[in-house]
Amino acid sequence: NYLSGTVSVDKKIIDIMTPNYDRIIEIICDKLGIGVITGFYGSLYGKFSRNLLKQPTEVYNCKNYSWIRLFKPHGSINWISENGKEYLTNDYEILKEKAEYIEIVTPGSSKYKVGMTNNTFRCMREEFNELLNPRDNYSLLIYGYGFNDDHFDTALFDSFQKNVLILSRDVKPDIINKALEKKNITVFYHEDDREYMIYKSKKYTIDMPVWDINQFADLFIG
């Protein structure tokens, strides 16, 4: 509901960053008829192009069709890296056969290092961070993110100069404190068996879990 109501005639490309490596966003977009720009080109063995991710309008028809530009800086379960070659494939048999070569950043002590040294991961992160440039005028939606990733937290905190909407069941105290200090940050969250909203630096108790994206879409988009 949220995706179909957000991609509109006014903005044909919506930018999404996810630290998750599942394909839920891609599947939902397919069902909604929304194209997904991943930075990879090709059908069976997709190859990564930074310019395709950076300048999608040079390749895709972004005037007549709706698109999601998807940044996956921790990799994806359909990315394969083998013998120095990297490609994207949606062929289940290939993914099953090459399971040990699936390219994702798993939780652990080497997480930050891998994200810095892998070229595709680094490009994904750098291009998304560029979108967070404080000089640009836009609003930012953060959904279900726990602010536990050093790669993005600094850039996200800098972007808090803009209008920011945070939907997350669990929110760290320092994020809540920032919302109480800055009127441009709105937060919906759950704490101590209650639902809360922080809006224009004031905290309210509410009667429904608006941090849930479906509840949010039903309430504000319909």
Where are these regions (language model features)?
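SIR2/sirtuin-family catalytic core signature
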Residues: 114-116, 122, 126-222
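Amphipathic alpha-helical segments that form well-ordered structural scaffolds
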Residues: 2, 24-31, 72, 120-127, ...
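Compositionally biased, intrinsically disordered low-complexity regions enriched in proline and serine
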Residues: 3, 61, 93, 102, ...
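Generic hydrophobic, helix-prone segments enriched in Leu/Val/Ile
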Residues: 1, 104, 216-220
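A short acidic-Thr-Gly-centered motif at the start of a beta-strand
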Residues: 1-11, 126-135
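Extended, H/D-rich, highly charged conserved domains that either
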Residues: 6-106
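Flexible internal linker/loop segments at domain or repeat junctions
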Residues: 84-134
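A near-ubiquitous, low-amplitude feature marking generic local secondary-structure context
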Residues: 8-11, 56, 107, 111-115, ...
